[in-house]
């Protein structure tokens, strides 16, 4: 199995803001450059791990978009993006999102009661975004079949499972130690 993701994480830059060390990576930030080979590797691995007998894939704006696009093209499953702005469409579901570094609203459109869905996102750290997505999908009456994040950094998996009952799958677990990304699994 290819390990492009893991190798790219080991060499990505780290920036410190306050006391927090951010890793800057193409999948989580879209910079410095998103290589097709990396996106292809990730989407291939994702497809092997998720239920593909679903109606829709759901992600939050913004960095889940390249991932769901690649998975959608490969599987012919359409996707829905929870946006950060309101569109005022009929049936739109607003949900409050709180992460370790921001607060705001997300807006869900395009989900019908009974839709079988998979949630995909780029990074889980505090779990706040995933909890918001899951709550919105439950309000819409969706049948959540799988939840997967590419990169796991922090305790978000446990928080999501405690708050929602859903287990979050991930491709890689990391932590930042001494200014470098360490691969834990």
Curated annotation (Swiss-Prot):
One of its GO terms (biological process) is purine ribonucleoside salvage. It catalyses: IMP + diphosphate = hypoxanthine + 5-phospho-alpha-D-ribose 1-diphosphate; GMP + diphosphate = guanine + 5-phospho-alpha-D-ribose 1-diphosphate. One of its GO terms (molecular function) is guanine phosphoribosyltransferase activity. Its main location: cytoplasm. GO terms for cellular component: cytoplasm. Keywords: Cytoplasm, Glycosyltransferase, Purine salvage, Transferase. Catalyzes a salvage reaction resulting in the formation of IMP that is energically less costly than de novo synthesis. Homodimer. Belongs to the purine/pyrimidine phosphoribosyltransferase family. Archaeal HPRT subfamily. This is Hypoxanthine/guanine phosphoribosyltransferase. It comes from Methanococcus maripaludis (strain C5 / ATCC BAA-1333).
């Amino acid at each position: 199995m290819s390990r492009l993701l893991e190798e790219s994480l080991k060499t990505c830059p780290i920036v410190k803001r306050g006391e927090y060390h951010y890793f800057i990576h193409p999948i989580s930030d879209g910079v410095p450059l998103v290589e097709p080979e990396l996106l292809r590797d990730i989407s291939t691995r994702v497809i092997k791990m998720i239920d593909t007998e679903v109606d829709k894939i759901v992600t939050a704006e913004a960095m889940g978009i390249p991932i769901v696009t690649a998975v959608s093209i490969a599987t012919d499953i359409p996707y829905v993006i929870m946006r950060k702005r309101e569109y005022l469409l009929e049936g739109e579901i607003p949900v409050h999102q709180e992460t370790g570094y921001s607060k705001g609203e997300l807006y869900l459109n395009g989900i019908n009661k009974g839709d079988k869905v998979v949630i995909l996102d780029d990074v889980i750290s505090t779990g706040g975004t995933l909890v918001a997505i899951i709550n919105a999908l439950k309000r819409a009456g969706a049948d959540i079949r799988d939840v997967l994040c590419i990169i796991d950094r922090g305790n978000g998996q446990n928080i999501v499972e405690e708050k929602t009952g859903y287990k979050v799958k991930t491709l890689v677990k990391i932590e930042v130690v001494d200014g470098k990304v360490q691969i834990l699994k």
